[in-house]
Amino acid sequence: MKRLGIDIGSTTIKSAVVDEEGSIIWSTYERHQSKINLKLSGLVHEIRDKFPLDKEMIVAFSGSAGMGMAESLSVPFVQEVYATRTAVREREKDCDVVIELGGEDAKILFLTGGVEVRMNGSCAGGTGAFIDQMAQLMGITPTVM
């Protein structure tokens, strides 16, 4: 059965459909401009048109605005750090560090020896300030990152 993941963040809505083998067969990325319900409705129609023969998909939401949507639709919510960690471990076995820049925050995940997550202050979210902070923390230059 195919799986559909929808990440609704503070500024964008992303989605991906994954086939039975775990390959991404379709994805989207667009700004929602605070019109989350409208964008989600359009996205659902687009998915239905793209996959008309797939009567069922496993669906989950993530993202800062995804929790409320998942709750209102009775769909599972997956915390985005967990989703990122799972995907990276499956697809990039040698990866040690993941930097995720979002619209309202930024995170760095250290994967070796378990998982350690660090997050910047919201005021620098989605900016290069976080990269500078993390480079300093790791004792390297931003260029090396």
Regions found by a protein language model. Name each.
Residues 3-7, 58-60, 94-99:
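Short glycine-aspartate micro-motif
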Residues 3-38, 42, 116-117, 121:
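Short glycine-rich, Thr/Ser-proximal phosphate-binding strand/loop in the N-terminal lobe
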Residues 7-11, 63-64, 101-105, 127:
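A short acidic Gly-Thr/Ser loop motif
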Residues 29-32, 48-82, 109-118:
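Short beta-strand-loop/turn "lid" adjacent to the catalytic site in phosphate-handling enzymes
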Residues 35, 113-145:
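Glycine-rich phosphate-binding loop plus the immediately following alpha-helix
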Residues 71, 88-93, 110-113, 137-138:
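Alpha-helix C-terminal capping segments
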Residues 80-99:
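Active-site cofactor/substrate anionic-group-binding motifs, chiefly glycine-
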